[in-house]
Amino acid sequence: MILTTAVFSGHKTLYGPFGIAGFAKKKGIALEPIIFGGTGVDSANQGMPDILPYRYEAGSQNIQAVAGLHAALTWLADKTDIMDVEKANHRKLLQILGRHSNIHIVGPKNRENCIGVVSCVFDGYSPNNMGDVFDELEIAVRTGLECAPLAHKTLGTFPAGTVRFSVGYFTKENDFEALEQALTYIEENS
């Protein structure tokens, strides 16, 4: 596959802060701005300047997030084991979830090329109710439609959504132990 454009969020897998994203495009691909004004480069022009990158930078830049993403990317550049650690943590999460018959993983069966995010549904409970339970047990999860209602329509989990677990480079053994204890508690008290 030949990429012509790529869009990314700074806080997903790149370990940057919320509030920053980016895109790259192949030369010759014309993109029209969707937000206008405030470039400080050609202020008399009501449109956006033709000069890159200013054409796509309306308003003040989120300098703190830019610095945070830069720091994250610098840190990532020195990590040679990050993919191995994340894949191992993803496998461990799948093993733990798979031990509980009341949990059904949503998504592809072959998860070898997936990142450490796993969406589930629980027998007899809505995702929002499960989120409240996990909150009481001090386990951080996302619940509901997770900013992706069309994905949930495709997966058949709309309108309730799922419970989403995430693991990454910083997930440690005590996190997995706490999750296993929480899931066992939930299963025994259902």
For the regions a language model picked out, list residue spans one by one:
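Pyridoxal 5′-phosphate
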Residues: 1-190
